[in-house]
Amino acid sequence: MLDTLLINIGQLLTMDQEDGLLRREAMNTLPVIENGVVGIENGVITFVGTAEEAKGLQAKEVIDSGGKMVSPGLVDPHTHLVFGGSRENEIALKLQGVPYLEILEQGGGILSTVNATKQASKEELVQKAKFHLDRMLSFGVTTVEAKSGYGLDDETEWKQLEATAQLQKEHPIDLVSTFLGAHAVPKEYKGRSKEFLQWMLDLLPEMKEKQLVEFVDIFCETGVFSVEESKEFLLKAKELGFDVKIHADEIDPLGGAEAAAEIGAASADHLVGASDKGIEMLANSNTVATLLPGTTFYLNKESFARGRKMIDEGVAVALATDFNPGSCPTENIQLIMSIAMLKLKMTPEEVWNAVTVNSSYAINRGDVAGKIRVGRKADLVLWDAYNYAYVPYHYGVSHVNTVWKNGNIAYTRGEQSWSTATI
């Protein structure tokens, strides 16, 4: 007898097509089972199919989905989860047209977050991040990448990473830890960025030993770290056994996309200014293009990443919130799906694949997350929607009814029909 059966699923989005990254037409394809059923035992999916195929199955608990939709848990592959403070006091300055550098000189911008993060205790950071994770869970997210990067010194970076490790133990959401010590150049290292990067590299062996970090990231941008500095830094991180990511071409077409493809990065993120050559190189690589349209939207910029061109040319595209206190303070990945549909010209099918299958590969979770398949852990979302297009169409709210993590209900806001019936 199974532990749980979800029955009467109007649309069961398994996302289970070909293994590996989805590109071109595969991104525009959604495997859907009408009148579907999912069986769960010991936190693992043991049955996926139609009601007809499920006849005779029994479970301790049978949940009637009411004809609504069920999908895999969503994957958010780019967040800056652990930080202190907030920056709502900067909104008025931005609206007045005060340049970011001037805000920075006043102690605002990233410096404000760095100072608040330094002053916060690890436990304070953990509790604050739990609040944000709870919200992510309520939007249907069950796997999250979490970056450090608000320390710019060894003590605070360690504190952020240790907070992430504690959250992994204490919160239902699966976390993937990324070291972003190279997020900016501290004032004391102005003009000496290579020395700062060497300092960050010197921290990596101990991080590897303590298994606190899976990915190493760097902010490759004008005025921060050059393409050559970024490549050298990430290649050294790879030599130490880390997988790598890169904040690439967010503002200027520096060649970050090209660098990511060249060194075999797991993902290149932002890519608003990615060149035609960069897009071509990404299309011919296994590097995922993780697009962050919520950031462009919140910064009130006109030019978004060329998501439509990327998909048409064969780039594997993922979507993420880029949740952070400065440029995208939202945990709402459903809103990101809507913005991607409207501003990146992605179809609903492409959007769904970008927050499940491709986003899981962007953080090396393609074999465990992003699909409903027998043998995988039961990370599932029941939606207050009857078809997948409705979720990005009806924007600005959460359509999530219930979230299962490893077969257990981790979040619910609706009423289900609970019984011990046999189909």
Swiss-Prot record:
Fe(3+) binds at residues 78, 80, 247, 322. N-formimidoyl-L-glutamate binds at residues 150, 324, 326. Its cofactor is Zn(2+); Fe(3+). GO terms for biological process: L-histidine catabolic process; L-histidine catabolic process to glutamate and formamide; L-histidine catabolic process to glutamate and formate. GO terms for cellular component: cytoplasm. 4-imidazolone-5-propanoate binds at residues 87, 150, 183, 250, 327. Its EC number is 3.5.2.7. Its main location: cytoplasm. Pathway: Amino-acid degradation; L-histidine degradation into L-glutamate; N-formimidoyl-L-glutamate from L-histidine: step 3/3. Keywords: Cytoplasm, Histidine metabolism, Hydrolase, Iron, Metal-binding, Zinc. Binds 1 zinc or iron ion per subunit. It comes from the Bacteria. The keyword Metal-binding applies. Zn(2+) binds at residues 78, 80, 247, 322. Belongs to the metallo-dependent hydrolases superfamily. HutI family. This is Imidazolonepropionase. It comes from Bacillus cereus (strain ATCC 14579 / DSM 31 / CCUG 7414 / JCM 2152 / NBRC 15305 / NCIMB 9373 / NCTC 2599 / NRRL B-3711). The lineage of its organism: Bacteria, Bacillati, Bacillota, Bacilli, Bacillales.
